[in-house]
Amino acid sequence: MATSAIQQSSFAGQTALKPSSDLIQKVGVLGGGRVTMRRTVKSTPQSIWYGPDRPKYLGPFSENTPSYLTGEYPGDYGWDTAGLSADPETFAKNRELEVIHSRWAMLGALGCTFPEILSKNGVKFGEAVWFKAGSQIFSEGGLDYLGNPNLIHAQSILAIWAVQVVLMGFIEGYRIGGGPLGEGLDPLYPGGAFDPLNLAEDPEAFSELKVKELKNGRLAMFSMFGFFVQAIVTGKGPIENLFDHLADPVANNAWSYATNFVPGK
């Protein structure tokens, strides 16, 4: 009787000491009854931005999403009216292009606004408006990077064009051709030296960051489009347009500028 109790106690203790990550089923007999001990695996919480229950582009009013948009990838809100992602190869290519253009747009939006912000706060480094800055190369003194002649000084638009084509063409050609430098790395999220802050160490946090990057990137692409339209319509930079709107919202807004192009006005 005592031996049986010791064996049962030892069996229960060994089971309790098993790691919580293991899925274990032990069966024993106690007092003529059948006892099953089971330890289940703790499920990993999933991000709300992925899977079939993720937010859709029209919220609860969204229609049935296409079967190929399963929520597997970041930024998938189930919207593809034109069917651009129906082909898997095209879908993969479009995902890559969107991430790359998002990153360029975020850098571009910063470059379009930051010089104006500095200029408004008394920092002088030449032309602050983004679409006017390049024209300084045609001036007598040429173009100084950040207004400092000791950094990069340029006076030839042809030289700038040639350097841009050669450098960017080489880099893009290398990327598209799949050079050996990036072997073994994810083409969109290489990590390592490209993640010095180790932001992608936690997989769950990394999946959230992918979504945030695309959301901000899409907003930046729309912003860049708006900056181009503003430059054509008003001839001013985005910060100056913002200041004008805040000073007189009625006279300076998209509607008032659009009506200037009405025939007969």
From Swiss-Prot:
Ranges annotated as spanning the membrane: 151-171, 219-239
Residues bound to chlorophyll b 3: S156, E172
Sections of the chain in a coiled coil: none
Binding residues for chlorophyll b 1: Y57
Record Pfam families: Chloroa_b-bind
Subunit record text: The LHC complex consists of chlorophyll a-b binding proteins. Component of LHCII trimers made of LHCB1, LHCB2 and LHCB3 subunits. Associated with super- (PSI-LHCII and PSII-LHCII) and mega-complexes (PSI-PSII-LHCII) containing LHCII and both photosystem (PS)I and PSII, in state 2 (red) light conditions.
Protein name: Chlorophyll a-b binding protein 2.2, chloroplastic
Source organism: Arabidopsis thaliana
Phylogenetic lineage: Eukaryota, Viridiplantae, Streptophyta, Embryophyta, Tracheophyta
